[in-house]
Amino acid sequence: MKNLKKLIAVVSTFALVFSAMAVGFAATTPFTDVKDDAPYASAVARLYALNITNGVGDPKFGVDQPVTRAQMITFVNRMLGYEDLAEMAKSEKSAFKDVPQNHWAVGQINLAYKLGLAQGVGNGKFDPNSELRYAQALAFVLRALGFKDLDWPYGYLAKAQDLGLVHGLNLAYNGVIKRGDLALILDRALEVPMVKYVDGKEVLGEPLISKVATKAEYTVIATNAQDRSVEEGKVAVLDKDGKLTTINAGLVDFSEYLGKKVIVYSERFGDPVYVAEGDNDVVSFTEGQDSVGTTVYKNDDNKTAIKVDDNAYVLYNGYLTKVSKVTVKEGAEVTIINNNYLIVNGSYDNSTIVYNDVQSGDKYLNRDSNYELKGTVTVTGAVSKVTDIKANDYIYYGKQYDVNGNVVGTVIYVVRNQVTGTVTEKSVSGSTYKASIDNVSYTVADNNVWNQLEPGKKVTVILNKDNVIVGISSTTTTTAVNYAIFKEKSDPFTAWFAKVKLILPDAAEKVFDAVYSDVYDKVNLAEGTIVTYTVDANGKLNDIQRANDQPFSSASYKADAKVLTEGSTTYYITDNTVLLNNTSDGYKALKLTDLKDATNLNVKIVADNYNVAKVVVFNNASFVSTTTSTVYAYVTGTADVYVNGSTFTRLTVLENGQTKTYDANAQLATNYTHKAVVLTLTNAKIANIALPTVASGVKLTNIDQANLRITDTTNKGYLLDPNFIVVDTNGNLKGLSDITKDTGVNLYTNDVGKVFVIEIVQ
């Protein structure tokens, strides 16, 4: 008895409280009568993990069985961590005459009696096998939490309700409680702070779960969702000494605690079952200007600077990196936690109107390398898939970086917000441009957009996320119906005889009856003029207008990029572009796949405001199967191939980050293995091999991988191709981390002057 009293005194102490936040526990139990979607499933799972319950056997939890008084006392003792004490109390004489010494719960009942958790039912009896009532169960739980002097039964009922123990339960206070309902109450009680009384006042302590779970203090850094180097099922944390490590995540979602100090409570198998948030200094604001180094700026009148720890982690656009590796862009939403962890969302490098629907396999948005779809692409806003981004959407583009500053992903926020109406007013004040659409005033992004808005004209404008007009929507028409080439009109052309011959997008000639009164003054057109037209309900031509075409005499076409260029102007060709070739045998319809690389093209182009071609008419263009292209690559292997009595060389190369093979027309005399090369391809075969421009023996003083820039010792800067590689002279793939200030390198550049191969030479 003396030892028991001593132990009771020890386990009755309390600790300081931390503000707690509930964490759901997934429903994983061995019990066949507990379904994963049952309302009590997660509660039973945590009680089982903490060894508070082992079920009723067979293997079942007994969700619909009534709770007995002996079972309830056992639950309470185990929740308080008193299982060992109860085992010791078996040797004590039974406290109640109806609980024999060999009763399975005699130790539990003796201990509860000694601790004041149970007083029996009177006349020296405990009534261990009687069915427990709802209010009685609440009384046992509240006593375990340390509450005293509550009125029976409504004082207990009210306190349980205030603590959130009975949410969703609708039981009569004198009704029998079942094990499934009790599991909910016990599980909720685990997260309630225990109380003790000081000078008659309640003082909160640690949550009840602290009695049965081990605890440790951590700062949460990342899960696999924020850093793919973290193993699935683990979470990266800083321990109390500031050391980075990983622990099991268990069945707890740690994402809601990123950057915060927490107390992690773990069960008998070591997996977390509850997280209590510690004291954290949290400040949130909108970034007022681009960050400089490790200094960020509030969006207030003074652009208040906040210097964060040089080694601070930052969850930047959803991925973990270091603050020194990124620039927090103006307008981003910033949360700083304890001055050593930042959460930055909406940090965008660029924004733009989308000109073409995004297709599967597209490497860039708008075929612009500033909008490369690199790594894992996360799309939010109006759509959630990159292939759901459409022409006339407005997008914000940002990147994700790892802790070394490498780009690992792309983030895109999509705004699909257009307003159609009449321009009713325009104004300008200093550098602020305004326009009203149907008398609703909008700010206009710039002078170029503002100049396109004509009062009295109906338009569809594109808005950004701040409801600013950023462009005019290109109108989508059915090209097969609306565009044609004027061939001729009838002679005579009168009210009694009015016909017009047009060449349609499929190159077929069609003669239309015309509504003379509608078109008589519009058909004085030269043969070959590109026009738009409409017909009435009877199929008669009732309008014809010359399209605004642009003639070019020396255009070039690039098949891989699907672009037609003349000088500095680029036009984008799509599957919807009407393509015709005017040959000596008449007009021929072309498909996009018919177009090959070509130069010195004589063309007429009709395009929208974004240079997306609606109609392209070539004049005697020759698109044959012969295509010539240039490839900048690094040769990883060379093989001589013998086929049907002939021999040719096959090169295996790294091109734009991908392994490819190219065949020469004959056997090559030179071995190009482990060399950077320029391949001229004709019909996808090697016609010529040259060596690219190289800067030899360079040493680097700065490597800015985030912005794809490097600087040598002469302070000369080089831009890196997005798909650059680093190798040594033996062809082994390396990384930028292998280059120090004393490392000599050769820099091989492509046709636009960007470094595509860095070769380490020492």
From Swiss-Prot:
It is found in: Secreted, Cell wall, S-layer. PROSITE patterns: SLH. Residues 1-26 form the signal peptide. Its main location: secreted. The S-layer is a paracrystalline mono-layered assembly of proteins which coat the surface of bacteria. InterPro entries: SLH_dom. GO terms for cellular component: extracellular region; S-layer. Residues 27-90, 92-155, 156-204 form the SLH domain. It holds the Pfam family SLH. Glycosylated; contains 8% carbohydrates, which correspond to about 40 to 50 sugar molecules per monomer. O-linked glycans consist of Glc, GalNAc and GlcNAc. Glycans are attached at Y297, Y516, Y520, Y632. It comes from the Bacteria. This is Cell surface protein. Keywords: Cell wall, Glycoprotein, Repeat, S-layer, Secreted, Signal.
